[in-house]
A protein has these predicted regions:
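N-terminal [4Fe-4S]-dependent radical SAM core
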Residues: 9, 15-19, 153, 159-209
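Short beta-strand segments
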Residues: 4-7, 54, 78-80, 106-107, ...
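Conserved alpha-helical elements of sugar-nucleotide-dependent glycosyltransferases
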Residues: 28-38, 241
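Residues at the starts of beta-strands that form the adenosine-phosphate
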Residues: 2, 49, 103, 257-258
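A short, charged/proline- and glycine-enriched loop
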Residues: 1, 73, 205-206
């Protein structure tokens, strides 16, 4: 199955959606879409064809996104979300539905918390993957291909087409225990993204963003990720897995001057 992953636009703005406090930052800060990249890398490792488009970083507006979707002709479209952008995100889903019959899946912090409201508000939206969605995306693609029951996929919400459109939430998707199950994301960055379009102000440029693990014991008021996405139990990648990716960056992306760990 061909899966189109996108960090969608927010109007014409340079909107940094992946950071703890999403927004248009005066410094020009722009985070990598590392959550999407992990899901894309995993999907490719399971023999799906992937495409990743980061609209805010590449200054691509909604019309540009729609054109890319028409050009790529995906079977499944995965859109990231955030609370500041959600109204525009849902409008984007409606626009996408006008040009394709591909299934549309939303992921991220806002839809994880407000899945019921988002499905009710947007009839064009097919699915929501809640929490750590890496495996959910791939399992959904495989279920759609094989026409097997999607009710068995954990971490999913959707509209039941056989029961008057009632909304269904499947079992909770537990956080990934073995972080080495996730493939490296640096090769995904190299193929689909432009490092010069990302900025972390205290890092040398161009920089790249990785994670050493997921989960956080802290309860910072400005960060929803532990409560919504990855929980409070910190799970780390093994040193060989992590160092191997760093060496790959050194050898294959010599322009990178610094690696930022966004744990």
């Amino acid at each position: 199955m061909k899966i189109f992953f996108t960090n969608p636009p927010l109007r014409e703005l340079h909107f940094s959606r992946s950071q703890r406090s999403p927004g248009v930052i005066k410094s020009g800060t722009m985070y990598y879409p590392y959550w999407l990249a992990h899901a894309a890398a995993l999907a490719e490792s399971r023999d799906h064809e992937i495409y990743l488009l980061d609209c805010p970083a590449d200054f691509i507006n909604r019309d540009g996104l729609l054109q890319q979707i028409e050009d790529q002709k995906p079977d499944l479209i995965v859109l990231d979300t955030s609370t500041p952008s959600i109204n525009f995100d849902l409008q984007t889903v409606e626009k996408i539905r006008q040009i394709t019959d591909a299934k549309i899946l939303m992921v991220g912090t806002h839809v994880t918390s407000e899945w019921h409201h988002c499905l009710e508000a947007c009839p064009a939206l097919d699915f929501i993957a809640m929490g750590e969605y890496d495996f959910t995306v791939s399992e959904l693609a495989e279920s759609l291909e094989s026409k097997s029951p999607i009710r068995e996929i954990a971490g999913l919400a959707y509209r039941d087409q056989s029961n008057s459109g009632s909304l269904i939430q499947t079992d909770v998707r537990l956080p990934i225990e073995d972080m080495d199950e996730l493939p490296w994301i640096a090769p995904i960055y190299k193929r689909f993204l432009t490092p010069e379009n990302y900025l972390f102000t205290i890092a040398s440029q161009p920089m790249i963003m990785l994670i050493g693990g997921r989960g956080c014991k802290a309860k910072c008021f400005y960060c929803v990720y532990p409560q919504v996405m990855h929980g409070h139990n910190y799970r780390t990648r093994s040193l060989p897995h992590l160092i191997g990716e760093m060496k790959w960056i050194e050898q294959n992306m010599p322009e990178i001057k610094e690696i930022v760990f966004e744990d």
